[in-house]
A protein has these predicted regions:
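Transmembrane alpha-helical segments of integral membrane proteins
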Residues: 87-98
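Short secondary-structure junctions and interdomain/linker hinges
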Residues: 27-30, 92
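Short, contiguous alpha-helical
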Residues: 10, 21-22, 29-75, 100-130
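Short, mixed-charge, low-aromatic patches
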Residues: 3-6, 40-44, 78-81
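Active-site-adjacent scaffolding segments
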Residues: 1-25
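Short, Lys/Arg-rich amphipathic alpha-helical interaction segments
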Residues: 69-89
């Protein structure tokens, strides 16, 4: 990743998270925990999944926080996982690291790309449920 890639990535991550939080703003606990037919998760479950996925992506490069530091509450998990991603990305400038994990290759660029795509995908998922 170049410095420009990281700068742009951090901006896109911030905008995406802003969109996510605006999408769920004002939803009460009942709505967050509501289940939907043919859906794996409630909205709270989707939020928890997004945060968990960011931790998982970082784990591919051995950069994740220890599991015991990852909150279970969805909004806290989102905050902690994104803070870690924002902390780690600038340290990856110029990194040529490629890690093979479970038969899949991971690089800093792939982690950034997946985190961005995954959150956008689930923002649309939540919007469809609402």
């Amino acid at each position: 990743l170049t410095a420009t890639d990281i700068e742009r990535g951090l901006k896109l991550l911030a905008w995406s998270r802003e969109d996510l939080l605006k999408t769920v703003e004002g939803l009460d606990a009942k709505k967050l925990d509501q289940t939907y037919p043919n859906e794996r998760w409630s909205i709270a479950g989707i939020l928890k999944h997004i945060g968990g996925a960011e931790c998982w992506y970082l784990d591919r490069l051995e950069l994740a926080l220890p599991r015991e530091q990852i909150p279970g509450e969805p909004f806290a998990r989102l905050k902690v996982s994104r803070a870690r991603l924002n902390e780690v990305l600038p340290t990856l400038e110029g990194s040529k690291q490629v890690a093979g994990v479970d038969g899949e290759l991971w690089s800093p660029r792939k982690v950034l790309r997946r985190a961005l795509w995954h959150e956008r995908d689930h923002i649309e998922h939540i919007r469809k449920l609402l």
